[in-house]
Amino acid sequence: MSKYTVKRASVLCIFGIGLFVPATGTFACGLLLVLGFWVLFFSSLLARFLSQFFMRTRSAPLFEVCLTLSATIMYDNLIQGFFPLVRMMLCPYLFITALSRTLDLCLTAYDADAESLECVGVFGIMIAGISLVRELVAFGCVSLPAPSGFLRIISFPPSNVIRFAATGAGTLISCGIVLWIFRSAGNDHTPSLRSEW
């Protein structure tokens, strides 16, 4: 994979984080969201691997869509069984992600260089990191999913001065700052943003 493709994929990951800001208010939600994202990604890879050996080329996208949606439904039911309260917050975002993947398969031609484990890894780490920082700043605690809701494992008085950074608007601003730093650090070695698009 070329450096250009990896660079562009990483930028798209940072932009995509903004869509999940409402669901990352707690580390418990962010953790389950990242796990769901990985389930979706690897089910798509499994479907593509199986379709190469057992199915025709024309049927492969349909098989991948069906397996991806099935994996999302199974993961949603699993969360509902173990963490019903957390599932109420995450359910829309899980299916939005699955729908986005389905539309991508149906409306665009597949590009093998457009997907990478690096991009998925960066996306997952940033989602988990943002949810962890938001909960620490806003509530002064770190939570894990539990059947009754959330299990707090660390708790201390939150700071009122920087609590704004944990709100939705503050998180979007923080993502913008991170993107600016990311782009500024690579200006000496990569073409401008306009030239990449």
Curated annotation (Swiss-Prot):
Give the record's membrane topology.
Multi-pass membrane protein
Which regions form coiled coils?
none
Q: Where in the cell is it found?
A: Cell membrane
Mark the transmembrane ranges. 12-41, 78-100, 120-142, 162-184
Cellular component (GO) terms are: plasma membrane
* Origin organism lineage: Bacteria, Pseudomonadati, Spirochaetota, Spirochaetia, Spirochaetales
Do the record's keywords include Transcription?
A: no
Q: Which UniProt keywords apply?
A: Cell membrane, Membrane, Transmembrane, Transmembrane helix
* Cystines in this chain: none
Origin organism of this chain?
Treponema pallidum (strain Nichols)
Q: Quick check: keyword Membrane in the entry? A: yes
- Protein name (Swiss-Prot/TrEMBL): Uncharacterized protein TP_0149
